[in-house]
Amino acid sequence: MEMTMRWFGSNADKIKLSEIAQVPGVKGVVGMIMDIPAGEIWPKERIKALKEEIEAAGLTLKVIESVNIHDDIKIGLPTRDKYIENYKETIRNLAEFGIEVICYNFMPVFDWLKSDLDYRLADNSQTMAFVARDIPANPQEIIDRVQAADGCFSLPGWEPERLSEVRGLFEAYKNVDEHKLRENFAYFLKAIIPTCEEVGIKMAVHPDDPPYPMFGLPRVVKNREDLDWICNVVDSPSNAITLCTGSIAEDPANNVYEIMAEFVKRDRIPFAHVRNIKFLPSGKKDFYEAPHMSKYGSLDMYKIMKAMYDNGFDGYIRPDHGRMIWGETGRPGYGLYDRALGASYLNGLWEALEKTNQ
């Protein structure tokens, strides 16, 4: 297991690589290049510069999150083949610089959705939350909230240039139901996985967040059955999963422990986001993102890590999101301090599992 933290790049992240390098047990960075629009090829010189900058700080770059998928692919438009070819070229370019895993999602319009990016806890820390009654009927209101909250840093999946086209996107997706989205997903996977096999990269899809339909948009990565379908539609180790414990557990019907155990055992989880959530009494699916320690949330983090350890997990992990604590401000979910605490906690659980199984 190799602990990592997400980093958005020196021009898009207030957290410094030197600070990440000081977090005990964190060996690598999950990198991205935020200003390359979906559908365009990632140039080799940009990848090389990113890798060299990270390695100069004493960290590794083995995982990229995310190489966004153009909506024409998800919708199934005739232009999709052009964007798929571009995606293949990006895969080849990333592999040339030692990238092993690409985390991505296949969600229409919104890459993730929360009702509150500044939810106050009793200790006055701030976190992200989802309360169904607070989700407006008009998706533009959600966009306005996000853009007001992101300060000087855009949020991943909510890039301004994409959100400016949101009305047109909803119109474009109006005839895309779950069956059609699944067909388009299969088309994409069948096209790119042979390239991944050639160059040694694993495509690891992130579960839908939340894992159920919103605004009438379909979801196809929402439960164990969907993950099984994905693995079987192209049966290859290169066709993999980023198991996000927070996202998959947002639907209480999903048994995150069994899902983790099964797909680690099947060698389909090269990358994991491990975070805790706390369900609220206001509704069955209402929650906030809790501190990582088990007792503060609704998930048993030891049980999650044990499911990974017992079934031979040998991939990359990151603590995913954190609260804003100790007066820190910045991109919601991506401050330094609470993620550092989460990484240390998860590393401690892993060390305990290793030593009790010697």
Swiss-Prot record:
Molecular function as annotated in GO: ferrous iron binding; manganese ion binding; mannonate dehydratase activity
Taxonomic classification: Bacteria, Bacillati, Bacillota, Bacilli, Lactobacillales
Cofactors (names): Fe(2+); Mn(2+)
Catalytic activity: D-mannonate = 2-dehydro-3-deoxy-D-gluconate + H2O
Any one of the GO BP annotations: D-glucuronate catabolic process
Database matches in HAMAP family: UxuA
Family: Belongs to the mannonate dehydratase family.
This protein's pathway: Carbohydrate metabolism; pentose and glucuronate interconversion
Coiled coil: none
Protein name in UniProt: Mannonate dehydratase
NCBIfam families xref list: PRK03906.1, uxuA
EC number(s) reported in the record: 4.2.1.8
Role of this protein: Catalyzes the dehydration of D-mannonate.
Keywords for the protein's UniProt record, in alphabetical order: Iron, Lyase, Manganese
SUPFAM superfamilies: Xylose isomerase-like
InterPro entries assigned to the protein according to its UniProt record, in alphabetical order: Man_deHydtase, Xyl_isomerase-like_sf
Annotated S-S bridges: none
